Amino acid sequence: MPPPPTPEMSKPPRSRARSSTIVGTGPLPPGSVQAGPPAIDVAASSFRVTTNPQTSAATEALSSLAGSIRRPKFRETSADHARTTSWPSPPQPVIISMPSAPAVPTKGSMEGGVLDLSLLNKDRDNVALLLYTYKPLLNNTGASANPAHPSLLPSAAASPNAPSSQVIINYAALPWNVQPGDYLEIRQINRTQPKVPTASTRIQGMEGEKPQKIKRPPALEDVKTGKGREGYVFRLGEDSPTANIHQIQVPDSVATAFGFQNRLEVEVRRIHDKESSHADYIEFYFSQYLGRADMWRLGMSLEGTTLHVGEKVSLAGGAVRAEVNFIIRDEKSKDGIAKPKRYSSGIVTAKTKTIFRSKSAQVYLFIQLCEETWQFDEDGERYVEKVVHGYLPELFARWADKGTSHVVTIIFFARIFYRDDEVDYLRKHDMVDMLSQDYSGQWYKDFFKVAVDLERRNDWMSSLPEIKRQLERSEREILLDYHLRLLKAKGAAEEEIKIVGKWCFAYQGNVLEAINLALNPFDEHYVDRDLSRTGLSITVVTPGTGHFAVDKNLLRLTTERMVDHGMSVDFVCLTKMPLHSVPLFSYVSHRPKGPVQHEDGIGAKAKPVVPDLLYFDANLSQVKDIELADCYSLPSWVSTSFYAVTHDKPFREDRFVARCKMYDIQMLGILDHNLTTVTVPLLNVDDTPMPRRPLTVDDRKAIRDSFDQSIFSGISDLVKTGSSPLDSAPASVTASYQSARLLAEKAKERTSSMSLSKPRGSDIANSSRLSPIKATSESDNIDLGKKTTPRSPSPEPSSLSLRRGSRRSLSPTKMTQLAHTSAVTNELNKDSPSLLKNSRPGSPITMARSISPVPPLPPTREQGDSPLSPVDSLPLSASVERSPSPSRRSVRSNMTDREHLGSGASTPKGTPAKSLRSQPSKGFIPSWVLNSFKPLLSTSKPSFAVPAMENVARTDVATGDDNRPSSPSPSVGSLRGRPSKGGPNPKPIITPSTPSPSRSQKPPFKPAKIIQTQPHTQAQGTQPLPIAAPPASRLPSQSEEDAISRSFRNKGHGLSRSHEDSSLRAQSNALVQSSRHFTINPCKPSAETIDRVRDAGGRRWRFVLPKLTQQHIVQWPSLIAPACLPLTTDFLPDQKQSDELYTTGTYTVQCYLEDDQFLIRSDAAETNLALAMMREMVSQRLSQNFQVIVQPHELTEPEKPRPMPIHLEKDADIGVELVSGGASEVLKKGQGAIWLSWANHIHRLLFHPTKPEIVVHWMTRKITHQTESVQWKGLVWPSGMKGYQKASATFAYPDVSMKINYNHLDHLINGERIDFAPLRYWRTRFILIPSGREPVTFPGLMPKNENLGSNDLLWLGAQKVMETLNRYLLKRPEGTPQQRSLKIVATTFDPSTCVLDEELMMDLARQIHGDSSGDKKKKLEGMTLANVAELMCQPDNGLVIRTRWWESRQHVSSFNGFELREWLQNTFEDVTGREKAQEWAAELTNKGLIEHVTKSHGFLDYWHLYYRLREPYNHMYSHLAKKEGKNKSWFSTSSKGSRAAPPSLTSSQASSSTVIAAAVADPSQATADLNTSQSGKDPSAGEQDQSSLAKIYLKVHKGEPKQGGKKRKIMMTQKRVLDLDPSRKSDRAEVAILHADVVHNARNAFHFELNWLGVTAALLEELRQKLSAQSERYGLRFVETPVEQIADIPKKCAYRTPIPIRLALAPPVIPDLHTRLVAVAHGTGQAENYFEYSILTKKFGFVLDVEATDRYPDNVEVVYSYRKAGVKYTYSQFCHKTGLALVQCVGGEAGFLWSDNRLVVSAPTRKGVGNRVDEARALRKELEDFCSDAEQLSKFYEEVLPPPPTTGESTPEEGQEEFEAKDDEEEQPAPQEKTEL
């Protein structure tokens, strides 16, 4: 019997009058502090039960109720549990009414609804039970279920019959036989609401309002109802016999997520198909720094548990936290195809793929500025407005909705082109530094402006106004202000100022440069590791269509870097989706002229092999027969979204969507008048008579497919036939369209050995190069002449005009003149063929020949055959662009000859009007468009064509059955004129074209016909403009596509066989198999082909989505929370590929226990060392971006084993095949192999079956392409700067050879090695600095009867921090210390000065290398004071008694309190513990054995308080005689010649007087211990140069090493291993290496650096927070700072740079400054930069961080273990006391370099980061204002200038004598030796 219920009512639900949650009377659920619901008999829940076994009234009442709802009773008994025939209570109570008991649920109390229990009658696989909830103590999932004893290793022995479960149920409640591990599901019972009309519903009906939509429970969002996916599935745990048989208990979080209500019935179903309950994909959201090893461990800890959408999971006691976003299961349809479907819950298995998305990533938003940015979209909104009013607000709103905390950087980037005359203008004014040339020889500059830099905000909407303002100003800043600032600086005249430059088009943009600039700082993402964020997201917002013309080498380099980092890029295009595949990168590459023939074996049939042209370098290949070709790449690392939102037009499926636009035509205004109809040219029709019948849908589809075939099947047919196209007649040889980029590259090859004409000089700064396209014009044509005439000067750009060029509609007269000019030019050409030879390269005729493509011609017809009216031809000046769909054209106008070159790549846009320049438009529109408006524009009505003469030998158009346009994205064609080699009598044809208007006088209009020749073609009239050639062959088969690279142009122009050696052929064949390149039709890709292409390069990201989408909708999940690289992949080369493409090697790792094994926990090593080592080796590789290779997801039951690429010897070749469960499955078995891959590396880790070792087989891909770095230069505007600055960067290939020494790493794991140096390890630097705040008052801050000053508290705080770190030192398994404690050697010197203190350096060496300790054989109790003193004075006893400098005083024979306390502990066996040692030390002080050197303190075990032996015991320290003086000053000349130093003046003001002071009096004596020779020059010689005076001053004490001697090396740091998880919350060893300073000055920064390999970063963050909180108590601040100096920031990140702050008034030159500093005991004693240091430390609260390298003595080499060898600090670096800023002191008028401490500014905070950003800006503004005010600087220099020394003042010796006399008077009588303790 359960105890009487005493329910504690919880908060009642809104829908019920009273609570139904009962707390504290039932059985205690596992892991809960709160008892579960009481075991209340439902039938008797309103009554008290007695022992009378009669039928109860409740039984009768409920029996009638059960009959009314037709609920079946239990009629059978189970073999496991006896069941009763009554429902629902045992048949034995006598009932006493209890009105306080809860009511029995009745038919009318079920929320007013009706229970639909019909489904319960169908079978015995379900049952209805009452649901109760309880509150678990912890989330009982994974490692967090039992944090005190986490699972060290996955084990198959973990009781499969009793899995952990959050659901509590009595087995007797289920009407079928059950056992632990069975799969069940909890579902809501459908309750239909009665449809009773009420007044409110009637009112709603009358008003026409829709009823409010009911919000679904969190776990059921985005899950389709009615599909059986909304239940909670779980594995049955252990039986709970104490639970009521009519109840089921679940955690309250589960009930909330699924909408289960307490004490309402739910359906419990049995699941027969267990596979249907397993989750295939689970997506997690997290918001912290989460390593990949932690992701893997979290996934393994969840195996076997149930997760539901919205559930929060944790690892390592809550150190790792994540939330489930969705759960996917593959659901098979009727046709047997598995499709991913969303479910509300699922059970995690080893095969479950985990997807992790970071809500705290570093996000880069690149916004492209180009010509299209300022254009209008179809909806009338400019693209720039779409960014600031559309995309960014929606993105920021979604960020806020998801609760992200990204660190965001927003950058505008642009490329500006310059004409020749503008380059001359820039050259004239010496502004060509950052000019570069593209492939066509066109000059450009790259601009990058940082609008937002590394900011973290709670409300990003507030940043939109500033972003908009910066966007609006960008035009003026780039096109005018940048050069204007340079001109004004040079004093240029007003009339010389011009607006220069032109925006590039979107596809010409520097997008790859932008991506690489973002990747540069990420190359060392493990340095300065931010412990609050994970991942890098790069988003490029562009007004283009996702197509970019790029450089091949830069594309290859970017691809390698993206794959190496395991990253992807998001392109957000603001246009409509184009009619071709995106993203699309076009480039020019060499290629073999024919597919390489490869033979698989002797006599085998030759197979064509095409190398990946992106990785094909002609100069490294043995193929000699090569050519240049246009190539296209679909990068797998780019995800494209199209944000084409029309805000004022809701989406409609039937709305016409424009996919191709001609911006110039739209801006003419003609289309605004609905007075005519635009006539679109007709499709080309074959001569073959077609049946006169209506075309069906299938007919149309067949025609379209045949058309596609004619475009994309050329190369496949060649490969299939295996014959050379050169064997056929020239007329049948199909030519390839050639882009302007291709023409330019060919021109470069032809002119590479020729000297280019340089009319104005010899170098780039004063000469103009000949454009490669001009060389093409002069050398690439046969019939046209080479001579050119000078081009007429182009009109100058308007000066200082910021108005955009006006766009006016062409008048009818102007339109008519176009046709007049066309006809006249053609007539002249017919009469004077030599006119072409004398035409200039930029003339319309030459441009048409070299630039404008001629569209495919129709089949030959006799003139007059066509009933159609002719159409005007294309203008010669317009560059007609062919889009990937040959039926689309766009027109580019308003271009010079070089601007036409940029149109080589396809874009669906036309040329916009000029911006920021009023210049006459030189472009015109297609003739077929003008022809449509002729009835409106012209009085004459010509109905014939106006052809122009062109020497065209195009054989790819209208010449027969072999006519196939080649390019999937054809570009501007090359119209090469070649003489016919075909038939003897070439037949004339007509080529439609229209010349551009001439600037000369226009003659009257006369129609004319020009005849030209074309081999094997004939035409007597002009046909409608053709759009495509007729189909020629079938589509290639899939097998044929496999043999062709998708980067290969699909045309066989000039193809020929190339014979290579067998090894090269084999390598090429393996390459294409491994890389898996496929030919696709980018204008009509099939789903299968797209998947294959993505598999070819994107296998690393295969499991980031359940199914790759083919729709380019906005990928909001990726933009909101970027995905991390998946943990698994399914790519693995076969044996043949591994032999040909990879270098391999093998090594073994022994599995033996080692003493130095700190990366493996001792308990795990003792349990199963090999398993623990294997797990750690996998974890470390996952941390380095490796992925576990598993079987393909769809291959769950492979029919035969997948062939493996590596075979070991027979006795070890066991279990090397892949498993679908990956590493987790192998670790559970404890045998087999784990395969991992990363970029170009593949590793296999194998348990050796017979030996205690792990065999590692590695494979590294061979590099067969060039890996030269790319040098970039441009202009950047960093945040906080004023204007654009010059910048440069290097883009380097990843080091594929062996980026990480994994052999060293594996032997580090097994304890054979302990050095991190050869590895890529994570590191971050912290400093401890004074905060400038008062210490926090708390009990125990001040010792009793002690008065500590502010400096004492700073020392005490540093000591407390070190004591905390000592508690984290790694200990032995038995708990004993394994390492010496961290200690501090206190000093008041600066770092560059303390190295000259010989006694201090000896103390430093003892601390680093260790010292001797006592034998603990003596007892202190009963020993006399003399005996104790004698022990203290013995050498090498652990107590260091030496001369110490402190606050400009020298204390002879002293020791500090910490050393004495430690000596007592180590020497006497009866002194146990710190407290006991402190008591004994205090007793020694009280009895007169020791005293404080200044008698101002009792005994305190602090590092900075010094004590000495009192008289007469001090004489026992024999080598320190009293005659040397008790307090000898640096300035003393006798035993009593010392004085107290005046207050100091710098940040090191508490630093002691410099050693140089002694050097002034006796230089040889000051450096005698250093064995240095001094050069004697009086430092007070009086030179005027303060810097030179300082050097002479330093030379006095900076002795140069002897001839051939070595510098003295001093180690300044101590290194320890920290155990970050002393409470064992994690299931692995969590260790880090700590580097800490030893010598410390409390007024300077104390340095720590942490190094680690793949630890749980949350534990590091916990340690940081603990140290930070402790530091603040004592007036200190624990600050994270960059590892390297801020002056080196631009070397890693070109768009970040320290901000220079110059001094308006240089510091004065004081000849005797060094003498004055000596007189006032200046701490550093260095006159150099004295005034600059004073500005920082005295005026603005900065603290010295690191001193410049050149300030250290020349004869000393200082070594810091956390700095790389050779790393130098150019300038001294300071940190502000708030930690928000870092400053380096340059000196002189150059002043300082300022940089915000991004690690602090961007760190999360409760108040919001905006405050920190504003604080840092305010600090910088204050310093800038002060440094720019010469008057304030002058006053400040006078204030800090030390007064000159005078002889009238009292000497230091006199003051010291008085002080010592007073000391002698206060001395107590010496204690007697018989005094005992």
From Swiss-Prot:
It comes from the Eukaryota. It is a peripheral membrane protein. Gene3D superfamilies: Winged helix-like DNA-binding domain superfamily/Winged helix DNA-binding domain (1.10.10.10). Residues 1-38, 195-214, 746-925, 956-1043, 1528-1548, 1566-1585, 1838-1877 are annotated as: Disordered. Keywords: Membrane, Vacuole. Residues 1851-1868 have a biased composition (Acidic residues). GO terms for biological process: intracellular signal transduction; negative regulation of TORC1 signaling; positive regulation of autophagy. GO terms for molecular function: GTPase activator activity. GO terms for cellular component: GATOR1 complex; vacuolar membrane. The keyword Membrane applies. Residues 797-812, 865-888, 988-1003 have a biased composition (Low complexity). It is found in: Vacuole membrane. Its main location: membrane. PROSITE patterns: DEP. PANTHER family: DEP DOMAIN CONTAINING PROTEIN 5, GATOR COMPLEX PROTEIN DEPDC5. Belongs to the IML1 family. This is Vacuolar membrane-associated protein IML1. The gene is IML1.
